[in-house]
């Protein structure tokens, strides 16, 4: 009696095969990769005429300060900029990708980019990777509908607020905003408040540090204030580098001439055997 086999189509849904594999490898002694701790303070607020973004300039590699003066405010469009926190490679790659898409859209339509367009592209990309792209963003810009400020989390969720903070120093920066922010801020008041919030993150968070970068976006204009404030300047007295106290200098070469010439003469006769 012949028995016919029927191919049963696989059931849909998430496959946990790799999870079982990871558990087996862990039981056999394989150490799973640990969570990567990153640090940054990025902020943004809406003022009377537009949007102001701010960021610190420290890039870390674990416990090491890899770069003291990096740029965390990324260009998206002439009227839109984006601050990035998280893994530097992810934030730069995501913002560059969306920036190129916005440029193609401007070429095709002949119109300025809208902030909501950049927001949609960013959140769709991050949501599709379920948080594995480590990019936490503060997006700000001014378009035909006015100023806009959004926060985008690595999993794809977003917020729309008059002021926002992200990164490991976000709590310290948010405390400054909640205490001093008010509607209708002038340009100078907004810049001062953003700089103060970034400094709060720099001095209260080990992952944030160095200088303060600020970007002011208004209708038809933008101003990027690179190294607007340096809360931790180098304190070297000499332009050549470190200065040492007297009698503790490091000498690479030292030539000391003798005070007088010494002549050695032989006295007596050699001993006989």
From Swiss-Prot:
One of its GO terms (cellular component) is proteasome core complex, beta-subunit complex. Its EC number is 3.4.25.1. One of its GO terms (molecular function) is threonine-type endopeptidase activity. The active site is at 40 (nucleophile). InterPro entries: Ntn_hydrolases_N, Pept_T1A_subB, Proteasome_bsu_CS, Proteasome_sua/b, Proteasome_suB-type. Residues 1-37 form a propeptide. It catalyses: Cleavage of peptide bonds with very broad specificity. It is found in: Cytoplasm; Nucleus. The keyword Cytoplasm applies. The keyword Hydrolase applies. Keywords: Cytoplasm, Hydrolase, Nucleus, Protease, Proteasome, Threonine protease, Zymogen. Gene3D superfamilies: Glutamine Phosphoribosylpyrophosphate, subunit 1, domain 1. It comes from the Eukaryota. Signal peptide: none annotated. One of its GO terms (biological process) is proteolysis involved in protein catabolic process. The proteasome is a multicatalytic proteinase complex which is characterized by its ability to cleave peptides with Arg, Phe, Tyr, Leu, and Glu adjacent to the leaving group at neutral or slightly basic pH. The proteasome has an ATP-dependent proteolytic activity. Component of the 20S core complex of the 26S proteasome. The 26S proteasome is composed of a core protease (CP), known as the 20S proteasome, capped at one or both ends by the 19S regulatory particle (RP/PA700). The 20S proteasome core is composed of 28 subunits that are arranged in four stacked rings, resulting in a barrel-shaped structure. The two end rings are each formed by seven alpha subunits, and the two central rings are each formed by seven beta subunits. The catalytic chamber with the active sites is on the inside of the barrel. PANTHER family: METALLOPROTEASE TLDD, PROTEASOME SUBUNIT BETA TYPE-7. Belongs to the peptidase T1B family. This is Proteasome subunit beta type-7-A. It comes from Arabidopsis thaliana. The lineage of its organism: Eukaryota, Viridiplantae, Streptophyta, Embryophyta, Tracheophyta. The gene is PBB1.
């Amino acid at each position: 009696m012949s028995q016919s086999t029927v191919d049963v189509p696989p059931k849909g849904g998430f496959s946990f095969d790799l999870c079982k594999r990871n558990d087996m490898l862990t039981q056999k002694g394989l150490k799973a990769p640990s969570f990567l701790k990153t640090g940054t303070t990025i902020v943004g607020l809406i003022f009377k005429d537009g949007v102001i973004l701010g960021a610190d300039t420290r890039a870390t590699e674990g416990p090491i300060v890899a770069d003291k003066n990096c740029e965390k405010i990324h260009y998206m469009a002439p009227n839109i900029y984006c601050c990035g926190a998280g893994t530097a490679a992810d934030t730069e790659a995501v913002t560059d990708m969306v920036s190129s898409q916005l440029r193609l859209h401007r070429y095709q339509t002949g119109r300025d980019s809208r902030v909501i367009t950049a927001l949609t592209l960013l959140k769709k990309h991050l949501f599709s990777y379920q948080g594995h792209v480590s990019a936490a963003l503060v997006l700000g810009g001014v378009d035909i509908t006015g100023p806009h400020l959004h926060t985008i989390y690595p999993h794809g969720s977003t917020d729309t607020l008059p002021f926002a903070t992200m990164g490991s120093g976000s709590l310290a920066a948010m405390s400054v905003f909640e205490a001093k922010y008010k509607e209708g801020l002038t340009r100078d008041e907004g810049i001062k408040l953003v700089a103060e919030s970034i400094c709060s993150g720099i001095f209260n968070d080990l992952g944030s540090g160095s200088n303060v970068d600020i970007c002011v976006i208004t209708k038809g204009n933008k101003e990027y204030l690179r190294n607007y404030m340096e809360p931790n300047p180098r304190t070297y007295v000499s332009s050549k580098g470190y200065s040492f106290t007297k009698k503790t200098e490091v000498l690479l070469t030292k030539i000391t001439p003798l005070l007088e010439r010494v002549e050695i003469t032989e006295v007596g006769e050699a001993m006989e055997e």
